[in-house]
Amino acid sequence: MKDKAYDITIIGGGPIGLFAAFYAGLRGVTVKIIESLSELGGQPAILYPEKMIYDIPAYPSLTGVELTENLIKQLSRFEDRTTICLKEEVLTFDKVKGGFSIRTNKAEHFSKAIIIACGNGAFAPRTLGLESEENFADHNLFYNVHQLDQFAGQKVVICGGGDSAVDWALALEDIAESVTVVHRRDAFRAHEHSVELLKTSTVNLLTPYVPKALKGIGNLAEKLVIQKVKEDEVLELELDSLIVSFGFSTSNKNLKNWNLDYKRSSITVSPLFQTSQEGIFAIGDAAAYNGKVDLIATGFGEAPTAVNQAINYIYPDRDNRVVHSTSLID
């Protein structure tokens, strides 16, 4: 059964998609967000929820979680005209009478216009690649950190040597009972200053070691077995929680099936963010044009233009003059 028609469907529930949905609500149209993950917020919420962001206008600094919470709160003003679909991956969309048919892995949706704000595509964590790892995931094995306080008083082991691994280790030093970092190389890939802080901290550093096995009972991991690189030495580390910080891999395989014009892994757009298909627009990291600057702030600026152009496309005979928000909201 085909879904009811929405004015604008936004593919992607990251910061840019959320702000585009808010602005569409401000303009009085109905909006649907289709997000492939189980939560809104995109990369700031998933990849660096506790890290500080410094380039959002009017905020000297805020975390990825705070940014996401603010955007969701802002959007909630128009919850009566906004529908959110989580854990749905857009496979294809086709032009039909009056708009577009959008097919996901779960359903068929209908929209009069589409705004693509899916960033660099769907992403997933790089895992340890060990047997039984999936059994412990999201119980006491984590690929990203949402709340530091959940590790209070625990023995925490962190695998990884990049910025996130080092930042989490330093942040947990005064919260956890103990913090141990396992890295396959002697040298870390994180910022030099952070590495110096790590080396002078109370964090235990085990290098160069690689994970070999996980031991546990039920859904809880209890020990991580590691082996020294190019040696036979094996250690068993007792733990309460394990954080795997090997980064995330992105995939835009479905994007290539959308029959648009592309520049490398992004969608080519006009100065008004129109793609090669009329009625379909792209913003944020998903959009490519000359002089593009891949910042969240840039995407925030692109969103109103794309929304206004989508409204002009849907309702060409309507008076679509842009009015400031101070005149629209009491």
UniProtKB/Swiss-Prot annotation:
Binding sites annotated in the UniProt record for FAD: E35, Q43, Y48, V90, F123, D285, T326
Listed Pfam families: Pyr_redox_2 (PF07992)
Signal peptide positions on this chain: none
Top enzyme class: oxidoreductase
UniProt cross-references to InterPro entries, sorted A to Z: FAD/NAD-bd_sf (IPR036188), FAD/NAD-binding_dom (IPR023753), Fd--NADP_Rdtase_type_2 (IPR022890), Ferredoxin-NADP_redctase_2 (IPR050097)
UniProt keyword Oxidoreductase, yes or no: yes
UniProt subunit comment: Homodimer.
Family: Belongs to the ferredoxin--NADP reductase type 2 family.
Name this polypeptide is given: Ferredoxin--NADP reductase
Species of the source: Streptococcus pyogenes serotype M5 (strain Manfredo)
